[in-house]
Structures are given as C-alpha cells and as structure tokens.
Amino acid sequence: MAIQKRVLVAMSGGVDSSVTAALLQQQGYDIVGVTMQIWDPEVTVVGDDYVGCCSLTAVDDARRVANVLGIPYYVLNFRELFTEKVIQYFVDEYFQGRTPNPCIACNRFIKFEALLQRARQMGFDYIATGHYARLGYSEEFQRYTVKKALDDKKDQSYVLYGFTQDQIAHTLMPLADYTKDQVRGIAKEMGLPTYSKPESQEICFVHDNNYRNFLDERSQGGIKPGPFKDLAGNVLGEHKGIPFYTIGQRRGLGLATGERTYVIDIDPDNNVVTVGSEEAIWGTELIASENNFILFENLTGPQELEAQVRYNSKPSPAIIEPYGEGLVKVTFKYPQRAITPGQAVVYYQGDYLVGGGTIEKTIKQKN
C-alpha cells in the first residue's frame, strides 16, 4: 500500500484555500491546515468588520473549515520575517519614489520559501495554496513549469515569477482548472462556511487600504511636501509627499492646469514630482533587475516573448535581452502606459510563465 503524501495547506480563511484543502483531501492526501500569522492582530484588527487574511476573523474562518473537513489546524508565527521582508520593503519602496508589490515579496520570501522550509521540518512532502496557476513538469523544457490558469480572469501567474524549480516541485495548486464560480459551488456543496465570503481587495496588512496613514505612521521625521514641476522645470504647486504618488496617477493631484495632468516622474532625492500630459507616460523600453527565470536557468541572448507590466494588464509582444550584470532590457512592440519602477515585469511564452523581474526605469518614451 502506497504511503499517503503529506500536504501542509496554507489557509487564509477564504474560499479558495478552503476548497484547496477539500480537493486535496478528496484526492487522498494527508492534509493539515495552517494559517501564517504575519501581522500583529492587536494592530490589524481595528474593527469587527475587518476580515483581511491575517485578521482574527480569518483565523476563525480557517479553523471552522478545518473542523468541517476533520483535519488538524495550526497557526504559525511568521511575524518577524514578514515585517522584515514585506512591510519594511513596502515602506522603503514608497519612500524611494517607487511602487511596491507586497504580494510578490510575500510569495517569494514567506509562502514559498519560509513556509516550505517549515513544512519540510515538520515532515510534509508538499505545501499547497489557493492560487490560480498550473504547476507541472515539461518534458519539452526538462524543467518544472508554471502556466496560466484556465480562468483568465483569476490567473495569478504574474505574482509567481519568483518560483524556483525546487519550490514548484513541492507545491500544489489544485484550483488551476476551475473558475471562481465553480470553486464557490464546490464550497457550498461541501458545506464549507466560507463559500460566500467576499474576496479581499486590500493589502492584507493595511486596514481599509489606507496606505497613506500606514506610511505616515512609519516615516522617520515625517513625510515632507515638495514641488510639483512640469517638464520645463516650472513649479505648478505643492505635493503632499513622495510616497503618495505613482507613475501615471491623475486623481488627487490638486492641480489646476487646464488639462488632464499625470505624474510622469518621481525624484525622491530632490523631493520633486514631475507632471505632464498623458503622452509622456507611455514608454516602449525598460530595464528590469532581480530577474528570475523558470523555463530556463539564465537569459543568454535576445528572446521574442510577451511581457506584462502590471497585474491587471495583458501581456504584450516584446524582446527581452541581457543588459549588463543581472539586468534585462525589455523592448515592447507597442508603447505601454505608465511603466512604473518597483512594479514587476513578467515574461510569458504563450501560457508558460518564463520569469520576471523588478522594473528599475523606463529608458525610452513615446514621442
């Protein structure tokens, strides 16, 4: 008789991770549920209505699901590591005039590194999450791979480009071939109490998505206002502080220029936010750092692929090529709107996730 494979399921208290646990249990795995405590509940739980993935409500919901499934359930403390790798990164990036993606940092350092390491120490064969992406092994590439989920609307491959081969080999994502409606239907049919729970659109550690207050509380010496300038260097008004702006932003500038005005550059060294017309926020080339590749070990020459510059956009034809030590130059066939330093650029070959990196700068803009 084959020995049951043991799986540690990351349960956020939402419907996706609930159904992940249920499906794997049905498939015969030996399941244990776990919620990662990544933020101080005394700070996070501002009101009874807060249901973020690290709230006490989320822990209660995950425990209720575990009880329905009859599986063991634990809460593991990752608060110190999360503060260092995600929260401090989030704060530092904004104060450097960049726009961070904390979900990618969390996946890279917490879920698929620290949790997998802990799972191995506890004797588990795999970890599992409620992400929508297809993991597997390709004979063609002779590598473990990540592909887009069946449901384009829910595909989360963009935030998974940091995967290593070892991590893919020891991670299960059983929702890859389901739609969200189907997942809710499974949860309802199985009597899981999270079947109708709404999706959280917030940054999990920022209550009410009010990141301005969050940053203000963590600023050293306070957030300083400074000048809005146009491309000619003329002062147009006063901004409220570098961390409150992102490339392509139009709302909330408080400028009366007589035309639609957008943030086109942020200079943290001189505390200047440059604004201009929409035309100035389109670019065709960028430089990316901290690149990771999944389909191959290293990028050795130019490749024609598709690249995506933000989570909710679509991949667009591009050429990626090495650009100095550790950097990649991405040249798009068509101009991209508001290429934003700090965000991820992710590379695709059809449905395959090739890899990705962090946008450092745009090096050419549309004229």
Swiss-Prot record:
UniProt site positions, description: Interaction with tRNA: 131, 343
Region of interest (Interaction with tRNA), residue spans: 154-156, 310-311
Listed EC numbers: 2.8.1.13
Active site per the UniProt annotation: 106, 204
Keywords linked to the UniProt accession: ATP-binding, Cytoplasm, Disulfide bond, Nucleotide-binding, RNA-binding, Transferase, tRNA processing, tRNA-binding
Catalyzed chemical reaction(s): S-sulfanyl-L-cysteinyl-[protein] + uridine(34) in tRNA + AH2 + ATP = 2-thiouridine(34) in tRNA + L-cysteinyl-[protein] + A + AMP + diphosphate + H(+)
Disulfide bonds: 106-204
Subcellular location as annotated: Cytoplasm
Binding annotation for ATP: 10-17, 36, 130
InterPro entries in the cross-refs: MnmA-like, MnmA-like_C, MnmA-like_central, MnmA-like_central_sf, Rossmann-like_a/b/a_fold
GO terms classed as biological process: tRNA wobble position uridine thiolation
GO CC terms of this entry: cytoplasm
Molecular function terms from GO: ATP binding; tRNA binding; tRNA-uridine 2-sulfurtransferase activity
Pfam family, any one: tRNA_Me_trans_M
UniProt xrefs under HAMAP family: tRNA_thiouridyl_MnmA (MF_00144)
Function: Catalyzes the 2-thiolation of uridine at the wobble position (U34) of tRNA, leading to the formation of s(2)U34.
Stated family: Belongs to the MnmA/TRMU family.
PANTHER family from the UniProt entry: MITOCHONDRIAL TRNA-SPECIFIC 2-THIOURIDYLASE 1, TRNA 5-METHYLAMINOMETHYL-2-THIOURIDYLATE -METHYLTRANSFERASE
Entry-linked NCBIfam families: PRK00143.1, trmU
Protein name listed in UniProt: tRNA-specific 2-thiouridylase MnmA
Species this protein is from: Desulforamulus reducens (strain ATCC BAA-1160 / DSM 100696 / MI-1) (Desulfotomaculum reducens)
Name of the gene: mnmA
